[in-house]
Amino acid sequence: SGSCSLKTCWLQLADFRKVGDLLKEKYDSAAAMKITRKGKLELVNSRFNPPTPDDLVYLDQSPDYCVKNKSTGSLGTMGRLCNKTSEGMDGCELMCCGRGYDQFKTVQVERCHCKF
């Protein structure tokens, strides 16, 4: 008949939030590795299952982002404002790294340009 069917596949990135959540999940469950004398990677803690090709692994511990560190450029979290009622990244428990925090109340006056 001279006709043919065409299929077009489109590749697109997943939602940015989903990508970030997946990376954070992998970061949190990354496997600590060490290099043996023979130059091979080995789990630091042999009680864990060996990592799969999809798992993240690391050789060096991440720096403590709670504390100021000039060599890594981390400013730490001391003195930053946090949200007492939030359980997210801006929450005081997480941001203050369990060190406690000062509480204060503020009154913020803003012009709302309301029309009645």
Curated annotation (Swiss-Prot):
Family indicated by similarity: Belongs to the Wnt family.
Glycosylation sites: N69, N83
Residue ranges of the TM segments: none
Function in brief: Ligand for members of the frizzled family of seven transmembrane receptors. Probable developmental protein. May be a signaling molecule which affects the development of discrete regions of tissues. Is likely to signal over only few cell diameters.
Record localization: Secreted, Extracellular space, Extracellular matrix
Processing and modification events after translation: Palmitoleoylation is required for efficient binding to frizzled receptors. Depalmitoleoylation leads to Wnt signaling pathway inhibition.
O-palmitoleoyl serine-type lipidated residues: S1
Alphabetical keyword list: Developmental protein, Disulfide bond, Extracellular matrix, Glycoprotein, Lipoprotein, Secreted, Wnt signaling pathway
Gene designation per UniProt: WNT-5B
The protein, known as: Protein Wnt-5b
Keyword check for Disulfide bond: yes
Superkingdom of the source species: Eukaryota
GO terms assigned for molecular function: cytokine activity; frizzled binding
